[in-house]
Amino acid sequence: MEHQDSSPPRFRNSGSNRVTVYNGTTLPTMPKSATPTSSSTTVTTHLQNIKEEETNDDELTQVDRSSPRVLGRISSTSSSSSNIDLRDNLDMLHEIEKSNTNISLSAPNLHEELGVLSDKGNSKEELALLPPLPHTGEMEITPQFDINEAIFERDDISHSSRLEPDDVLTKLANSTRDATGEDQGFVVMTHGHDASTNDDSQLSATILDNQTSFDLSKALEMTSHSNISNIINSSGSEGRRSRTPVSNSTLKPNLSSPESAEREANTTSSSSTSDHGATMQYDPKKIITPIPVLPSSVREQQQNNAPLRERSRSNSSALASTLRDTIISGLPQNINSVERKLSRKSNRSRKNTVTFEDRLQKLPPLSTQISNQYAKVAPAENNIALHFHNLPTPVSNTQTPVTFQSESGLTGGEKKMPFLRRASSALLRKTSAKNCSNLTRTNTPTLSTSSTFESDLNARQPMLIRRSSTIDNKLPRRQLSCSKLYSRLNSDSKFANSSRASEEVLVSTPNDTEHVYRKTSLGSKIKRGFTRILSDSNNSKEILTLSPKSMVTTGPTELSFSSLSTVGGHPTTPVSKENDRVSIDGVSTFNRASTSLPESSTDDISPLREEGKINVPKRTSSRKILSKNSSKKNVLPEQQTKPSEIYLDKEALQSFVPVLSVTEGTHRINRSSLQTQSTIGLCITNLRNKEGMKLNAKEYVEILAQQQRKEDERYAVLERKFASCRWCSDKDLQYLKKKRISMNKIWSDYVRFYRGKLNNP
C-alpha cells in the first residue's frame, strides 16, 4: 500500500489548534468539546478486534462497518474513484492504529447507524452523515435521527466547518464539483495525542478552548429555518426537497429560552407555508379588531369572495389574509342579515304568486267589449287560425309580476308545487277537452256576429288570415285542416280559381248550425278503413265490367283523364284540354307501365281509338296497371310468347351436361350466368330459335319438372363428394350451396309460369 510507513506520525502545535502531519499531509483533529471520553475504551477494544482480523478476506468490509472515522458521501457518477479513495483512507487508519492513538468518539449508537448505512452499496445513501453531537454544556446523548434529518444537519455543519483533506478527497472534489451543494462529502478525522507526549488534562484543556477557529459546538447551534430554506434554494436541490419534507419535529433544535421557542415556532409555520404550499390552520385568537363586512345579498357576498379566492390561488403567501377575510365575512351577524332578506323575499313572492287554478278560475268571459283587445294581439301572432279560447288571460296593472325565488327561501310545501301543478294541469286538460265547445258557446256569443270585431280584423289582418279565420270560426275541428289547406291554396295564383268555389260553399254554411266534436276511437278508424277498401274494390269491379260506351254515357264520376291515342299497342302523349295537372300524372303512369305490357294487350286498348273521351278513375286504373306490371316483372322475355308455340329439343336436352364453376362466388360482378351453368339455358335457346319439336304446355311442364329434379340431384352429389374428399375449402362449399338454392329458385319460377299457362289457356 502507498501510505504504509513504519515511522510514527509527527505532531505540530500551533496555538490552540491541533494539526496532524502525516507523510507531508496536514490532517486536522477533532476537538473534544463534543466527544465524551466514556466511549474511548469501547472504540479502542473495537479497533483491537479489527487488528486481529486483519488476515481475513473480509477485513475491509469489517473495518468499513465498524470504524466511524471516515464518513464521505460518494456520488453515483464517481463510484470507481470513490472505492480507491476509501481503500486509501482505511490504510491510513491502520497506520494511525499502530501508533496506539487514543480516539474519543461520540455516541456509541453511531456504530449501529453507520453499519446499517454502509451495507447499501455505492449509492448516494451509502455512507450516512455524522448525527449531531450534544451541546457542550449538556453531556446527554442525542437520540438517533433518520436519514432525512441527518441530511439537513449535514448541510448546517458543512456550512460552518468543512474538513476536507487534500489527499483523501481530491478525486471526489473533481468529479462532483457541480453538485457540491447537494452531494458534497466530508470526512471527520478524530485524532488524539499519544499518551507519552500529551496527557488527558492537556488534551481536554486544549479541546475545551472556546477561542479556536474550528469549534464543533457551533455546528450544533441550528440556524433559523429561513436560512436553511435559503441554503436549499441556493444549492438547487429540488429532488432532495421533494423527498425530505420540512416538519417541526425534524428541524426543532434544543431550545434554551421560551422567547426563542416562540420565534422558532413562528418561523417554522411561515417557512412550511411558503416552501411547500401547505394549508395552514388559522388561529381565530390572533384576529385583531375584525372589520364587520355586511354584503347586501348572497350574490354580493360571492362577488366579494371571488377576488380573494383568485388571489389565494395565485399567491400562496397571502393565504392567511384570505382566511381572515373569509372568517370575518362568515360571522353570525352576516348570516342573520342574509336570512332576513331571503325570508322577506320569499314572503313577497308568496303573496304575488298566482297559481294555474286561480288564473283558470279568474278567466273573464269573452264579450264584445274586450274583443278589440284580443284583436290587437292577433296580428302579432303568425297563426292562421285564431283559437280564442286558448288566448292568455290579460294581466291587470295592479298585479306585480312573479319574481324569481330561490330554493333556499322556499318551504317544503312550496317545493312540491310544480309536481302538483303538473298533475292538476293534466286533469284540467282532460276536462277542458270535453267541455271546450260548451264553454266557448254557452258563455260567450259568436265572435263572427260582432261588427266591431269584424271591422277591427279587416283593418289589421291580411287577406289570407282574414279569410281563414272566418272559416275556422264556423267549422268543427275535423274540417279545420281542410280550411287551412284551401287558405294555403288561395295564396297561389294557380289554385285561386279552383278553390274559390269550394270556399264559397264552406262560407255559406249557416252560423247557427251546431257542430259536435266527437273523439274517434280505434274501432271506428278500423271500420272506416275496411269500408274504404271495400268501396274502392267495388268501384273498380263496376268500372271493369262497364263497356267503353257505357262509361262515356255515365258521365264524369271523379277526376277525368284526357283521351289516349295508342300506336302499336303503346300509349302516346295525349291531347290535354282541361285539368292538365291530373291528366299528365295519369299519362305518366301509363307510360311507365307500357314498357312491360305484352303484345296481346293491344286488343284491350284498341277500343280506345274509337272513342273521343273516356273517363276512367285514376286510382283504379293505376292499380290495375301496376298489378299487371308486378305479375310480369319477373317473367323472361321468351315466356311472353303464345302458349301454343313451344319448342324443345329432347335429344339435346338429355345429352347436354352443363359446366359448373364451383370456386366462383355468387355475388361477383364478372361471374358467369347461372342459366349457362344449367339446362334451363338450353330450354330458353330452343324457345327463342324455335328448335326441336313443338310441344303443348302439359308436356313441356312435365319435362321441366324432371330437369329440375335431375339438376338438384346433381348439385347434391357434388356437394357430398366435395365434403368427403376435403380438397374443397369451406368457402367453395358455401358457394356451391348458394348456387344450388339459386338454381332451384330459377327452375321453380320457370315451371310455375308455364303451369299457369296450362291452367289459364
From Swiss-Prot:
Residues 1-82, 229-320, 590-640 are annotated as: Disordered. Signal peptide: none annotated. Transmembrane segments: none annotated. Keywords: Acetylation, Phosphoprotein. Phosphorylated by CDC28. The modification N-acetylmethionine is found at M1. The keyword Acetylation applies. Residues 13-27, 244-259, 266-276, 590-604, 627-640 have a biased composition (Polar residues). Residues 28-45 have a biased composition (Low complexity). This is Uncharacterized protein YOL036W. It comes from Saccharomyces cerevisiae (strain ATCC 204508 / S288c) (Baker's yeast).
